[in-house]
């Protein structure tokens, strides 16, 4: 019986324990006069992810979206959302675990964060803001390539 257990492959484990809003901020510093201007915004999106180890195989992933909208030189609004999730991830080798935490989990969190940003902007009486989907897999691959290039440069 013990040999049967040892011969079985250990299966990867992935569970979403919880998805929640960790922090929200919305500022419209130049209202109400900004509403009188022609709406030709310059919208800038910054993203960041952070991972915290909560317990063995339990991780908190926090996706931060910061949206800055300007009309010419004036800030129309600044919106920041931290969307978080607690994930159980077990039996994954390090390269796949890193990919899961940096790409797969943010892919799960992004629609929630995008909805929160859209709701805040609408409640601020600004035109609806629909953020485009993000390819976190491509961002992860780009980050890994940059890290390898920096390591190669440091070793040379």
Curated annotation (Swiss-Prot):
Keyword Cytoplasm: yes
SUPFAM superfamilies linked: SecB-like
BP terms from Gene Ontology: protein folding; protein tetramerization; protein transport
One annotated GO molecular function: unfolded protein binding
Subcellular location: Cytoplasm
UniProt superkingdom: Bacteria
Principal localisation: cytoplasm
Keyword Cytoplasm part of the UniProt annotation: yes
Keywords, in A-Z order: Chaperone, Cytoplasm, Protein transport, Translocation, Transport
Gene Ontology, cellular component aspect: cytoplasm
A Pfam family reported for this protein in Swiss-Prot or TrEMBL: SecB
Family: Belongs to the SecB family.
PANTHER family: PROTEIN-EXPORT PROTEIN SECB (PTHR36918:SF1), PTHR36918
Reported function: One of the proteins required for the normal export of preproteins out of the cell cytoplasm. It is a molecular chaperone that binds to a subset of precursor proteins, maintaining them in a translocation-competent state. It also specifically binds to its receptor SecA.
Binding partners and assembly: Homotetramer, a dimer of dimers. One homotetramer interacts with 1 SecA dimer.
NCBIfam families: PRK05751.1-4, secB
Protein known as: Protein-export protein SecB
Natural source organism: Aeromonas hydrophila subsp. hydrophila (strain ATCC 7966 / DSM 30187 / BCRC 13018 / CCUG 14551 / JCM 1027 / KCTC 2358 / NCIMB 9240 / NCTC 8049)
């Amino acid at each position: 019986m013990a040999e049967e257990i040892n011969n079985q492959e250990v299966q990867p484990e992935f569970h979403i324990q919880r998805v929640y809003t960790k922090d929200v901020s919305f500022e419209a510093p130049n209202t109400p006069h900004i509403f009188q201007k022609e709406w030709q915004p310059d919208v800038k999106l910054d993203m960041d992810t952070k991972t915290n180890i909560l317990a063995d195989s339990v991780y908190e992933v926090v996706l931060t979206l910061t949206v800055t909208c300007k009309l010419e030189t004036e800030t129309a609004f600044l919106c920041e959302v931290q969307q978080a999730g607690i994930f159980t991830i077990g039996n994954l080798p390090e390269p796949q675990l890193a990919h899961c935490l940096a790409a797969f989990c943010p892919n799960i969190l992004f629609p929630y964060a995008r909805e929160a940003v859209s709701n805040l902007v609408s409640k601020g009486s600004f035109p609806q803001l629909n953020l485009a989907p993000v390819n976190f897999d491509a961002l992860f691959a780009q980050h890994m390539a940059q890290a390898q290039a920096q390591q190669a440069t440091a070793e040379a």
